[in-house]
Amino acid sequence: MMSTKRWVLIGAASAVVLVALVVGALVMSTGAGRGSAASSAAPTTVVVVFAMAGEDGVQAAQLVAAVDVATGAFELRETSATVSIPGTSYSRLRDAYPFGGAQAVAAALGGGSIAAGTGWVDVSQEAWQRLLASGVDVTIPEAFQTFDDVAERYSDFEVGVQHVAVEDLRGLVNGVAYLAPDSRQTILNALAKASLRAMASATPSQGVLTSLTTEQWTGFAKALAKN
């Protein structure tokens, strides 16, 4: 009987090349390391960007969540949405990441500049994997399989609740792009919820870059813990 699973090849053969992981220290200072200084006013919304190598081998914004600082509630932003990225020919939100990280993504969401009352958090691929080192429970609505021919890693995602090991995180993130919109949204919502909850206990050694001050981060982390 023919399998109904979707196969996704991740790696050199499909132009998805695992590039060097970005290692960065947590910067708890206003606008540090990403260009323009952030507003002195405490943000009411924080754009959290989780990065991972995309199909062209370049780090991209794979998961973008706009988080309410007061409640910790979040709304995912469509990473394939059309935006303006100054100085480039790229037009998808996810592609803003190489041109300034989470700050560039937040600016793209704001139509070219970061909206008033908005902060940002930049979670690199390595930092994301570290946050979810113990894996994550996700409900898989649609079965699919991935094979990373660079890392030589095969990942099998069955329908139902599944504990996804951190070694399969890249396969999950890249594979969901080929699923039906509803299936993709279900998986990304669960992944965002778990990732934000894990970030609530992040420490400076975990490689997260942010525009928030130390005091603002403390309050934000408390809100994230509600997820």
Explain the meaning of each model-derived region.
Residues 17-20:
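Hydrophobic alpha-helical transmembrane signal-anchor segments
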